Amino acid sequence: MEQQKIPQATAKRLPLYYRFIQNLSLSGKQRVSSAELSEAVKVDSATIRRDFSYFGALGKKGYGYNVNYLLSFFRETLDQDDITRVALIGVGNLGTAFLHYNFTKNNNTKIEMAFDVSEEKVGTEIGGIPVYHLDELEERLSSDIQVAILTVPATVAQSVADRLAETNVHGILNFTPARLNVSDNIRIHHIDLAVELQTLVYFLKNYPQ
């Protein structure tokens, strides 16, 4: 299987499939059809079959998909046996919420440390996660932390990203409105909640169901 030939849109849907398949396995279900998957994850059946076709024969016509096989396959494909260690920068309201949540439903993803400049927060633990001063960023980030979550003010987002580029971080989940410029070896996913909300409102007004 050549991962580079899988469309990015398909890759983004894989965790969604995996989560639903996990729930099916926990409920004791042995097999599932593409129609059942479609109803659960709100992706049309043709798209699901096309997504799955990139990985070869995952199911049988007239039978559907074996739940345990899919679970094992996607677990390996998504590297669920490898721990992803994450650093969070910016312990405001959103950052604090992340620390309390800490991906409790994803056993392979864990925020290990956080950074801020607030004297009230530095030196404390939030959700069991230590908060260090931002000045200690390069010193504290260990080589096994390759992902960072940015929840800092937009005005400092680029400078923080520049510093992260000098570490072993290769992925940034950016929750600030700033559009960051980084080297090609760092992948950034931008999540602007205000833009998402505006988009939702636009669709509600212009594409009524």
From Swiss-Prot:
Disulfide-linked positions: none
Keyword field: Cytoplasm, DNA-binding, NAD, Repressor, Transcription, Transcription regulation
GO molecular-function term, one example from the UniProt record: DNA binding
GO BP annotation list: negative regulation of DNA-templated transcription; response to redox state
Location(s), subcellular: Cytoplasm
GO CC terms: cytoplasm
Signal sequence coordinates: none
Binding residue positions for NAD(+): 90-95
InterPro entries: CoA-bd, NAD(P)-bd_dom_sf, Rex_DNA-bd_C_dom, Tscrpt_rep_Rex, WH-like_DNA-bd_sf, WH_DNA-bd_sf
Chief location bin: cytoplasm
DNA-binding region positions on the chain: 16-55
Summary of subunit composition and partner proteins: Homodimer.
Task of the protein: Modulates transcription in response to changes in cellular NADH/NAD(+) redox state.
Similarity comment: Belongs to the transcriptional regulatory Rex family.
PANTHER family: REDOX-SENSING TRANSCRIPTIONAL REPRESSOR REX, REDOX-SENSING TRANSCRIPTIONAL REPRESSOR REX 1
Name of the protein in its database record: Redox-sensing transcriptional repressor Rex
Organism of origin: Bacillus anthracis
